[in-house]
Design a protein with these regions (language model features):
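Structural motif
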Residues: 60-63, 110-118, 166-171, 177
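Blade-edge motifs of beta-propeller repeat domains
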Residues: 51-83, 129-139
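Acidic carboxylate motifs that coordinate Ca2+ or other divalent cations, activating on Asp/Glu
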Residues: 96
Length: 200
């Protein structure tokens, strides 16, 4: 399963990224589901406005993504996610003049595993799902969660600690791995594929 979590902001270079937390808590703001709004954020890019809201308690939340503008109306996205929403970014990673929305979900438990929920605007009137290529091979060695994500120029950057044998969950000693993903057209839709890896 594609996995993702929190966020970090870019500095002058990928190696100078400053870690931050972009969790946004808000009071109830209404929505499609009952219950308090655990997260509510609005972002606009290229004439499209995205409203992202989650609600619910426990290990699962109900996520709602609505979009307006363009040629709409857009069909709202509503789904259950395993964990809590901690961040949202909008970008145009493929440079086609139509934005994407990236929602980061942090899973429960000590590993803080999570998932990425992402959609791309198509023909200014529809939202198409984006998948994140699964970690495998050398990129997955030493991976035990604790991801951080951010948009850096035309790249979705993913950073996580590298664990060595014998490391505890609270202390990874293998450094940090950073993967740059580019948005590509796949056979069944849009997919984020890794294009570069840095260990430091």
């Amino acid at each position: 399963m594609a996995q993702s979590l929190m966020t970090f902001r870019s500095g002058q270079s990928p190696l100078a990224l400053i870690l931050t937390t972009c969790a946004v808590l808000s009071s109830p703001a209404g929505g499609a589901w009952a219950g308090s709004a655990a997260f509510h954020q609005t972002e606009t890019l290229q004439g499209i406005t995205f409203h992202v809201q989650s609600s619910g308690e426990g290990s699962q939340q109900q996520l709602s993504i609505t979009a307006s503008g363009g040629k709409g109306p857009f069909t709202p996205v509503r789904q259950v996610v395993n964990g809590r929403v901690v961040g949202v970014r909008v970008a145009d990673l493929n440079g086609n003049g139509q934005p994407e929305v990236y929602v980061f979900v942090q899973g429960a438990g000590s590993g803080s595993y999570g998932e990425l929920v992402a959609y791309a605007v198509s023909n200014s009137s529809a939202l198409l799902p984006i998948s994140l290529q699964e970690l495998s091979g050398p990129m997955a060695q030493g991976y035990q969660g604790h991801d951080q994500f951010e948009v850096v120029e035309s790249c979705l950057a993913r950073r996580f600690p590298i664990y060595k044998a014998g490391d505890t969950n609270a202390k990874a000693t293998g450094g940090v791995r950073q993967i740059c993903y580019k948005l590509r057209q796949g056979e069944a839709g849009w997919i984020l594929r890794p294009t570069s890896v840095l260990n430091f």
